[in-house]
Amino acid sequence: IQVAAQNCWVKKGGAFTGEVSAEMLANLGVPWVILGHSERRALLNETNEFVGDKVAYALSQGLKVIACVGETLEQREAGTTMEVVAAQTKAIADKISSWDNVVLAYEPVWAIGTGKVASPAQAQEVHAGLRKWFCDNVSAEVSASTRIIYGGSVSGSNCKELGGQTDVDGFLVGGASLKPEFIDIIKAAEVKKSA
């Protein structure tokens, strides 16, 4: 088990009250940071490009990154899910030279904290689409080796079916991580890892 911070700032130094620097996390021995979460994109207006800059800087400071991408309900209903997540992923790819220390987390915004969850088929479709995007735009090696995890109302009751999808490599768990059912989610991920 390793610890991840929920955010870090985009550059070194400066007076950015309330922000945590990548250097602080590295000095504390925190190996991971979550960047691009939909709440920060929506509430703090973090753009795709800004998230790309944050990912690049965190990596430059020796952190590993869980980079979040995902669409709103309106975007899903408009049929633009892949365009949206591809643009978010491209903004990261444009700023980094290696995906070795990046895990991509697909988190459909409409499924975060709402109790709604993408069906296993919907999750698989987007994860497979992201792998194809990597293959077409980065490399086949990155497509095969980059972990793509799912986040969005993951629970003890849906984790096995979601985790059973070919391209779902694990979970970014929110509220359920504070409940006893989190053990079921961990066990579902362990089964996938050992399979």
Swiss-Prot record:
<dbReference type="Pfam" id="PF00121">
    <property type="entry name" value="TIM"/>
</dbReference>
<dbReference type="InterPro" id="IPR013785">
    <property type="entry name" value="Aldolase_TIM"/>
</dbReference>
<keyword id="KW-0312">Gluconeogenesis</keyword>
<dbReference type="GO" id="GO:0006096">
    <property type="term" value="P:glycolytic process"/>
</dbReference>
<comment type="pathway">
    <text>Carbohydrate degradation; glycolysis; D-glyceraldehyde 3-phosphate from glycerone phosphate: step 1/1.</text>
</comment>
<keyword id="KW-0324">Glycolysis</keyword>
<dbReference type="GO" id="GO:0005737">
    <property type="term" value="C:cytoplasm"/>
</dbReference>
<dbReference type="InterPro" id="IPR035990">
    <property type="entry name" value="TIM_sf"/>
</dbReference>
<comment type="subunit">
    <text>Homodimer.</text>
</comment>
<keyword id="KW-0963">Cytoplasm</keyword>
<feature type="active site" description="Electrophile">
    <location>
        <position position="37"/>
    </location>
</feature>
<comment type="pathway">
    <text>Carbohydrate biosynthesis; gluconeogenesis.</text>
</comment>
<keyword id="KW-0413">Isomerase</keyword>
<dbReference type="GO" id="GO:0004807">
    <property type="term" value="F:triose-phosphate isomerase activity"/>
</dbReference>
<dbReference type="InterPro" id="IPR020861">
    <property type="entry name" value="Triosephosphate_isomerase_AS"/>
</dbReference>
<feature type="active site" description="Proton acceptor">
    <location>
        <position position="107"/>
    </location>
</feature>
<protein>
    <recommendedName>
        <fullName>Triosephosphate isomerase, cytosolic</fullName>
        <ecNumber>5.3.1.1</ecNumber>
    </recommendedName>
</protein>
<dbReference type="InterPro" id="IPR000652">
    <property type="entry name" value="Triosephosphate_isomerase"/>
</dbReference>
<dbReference type="GO" id="GO:0006094">
    <property type="term" value="P:gluconeogenesis"/>
</dbReference>
<comment type="similarity">
    <text>Belongs to the triosephosphate isomerase family.</text>
</comment>
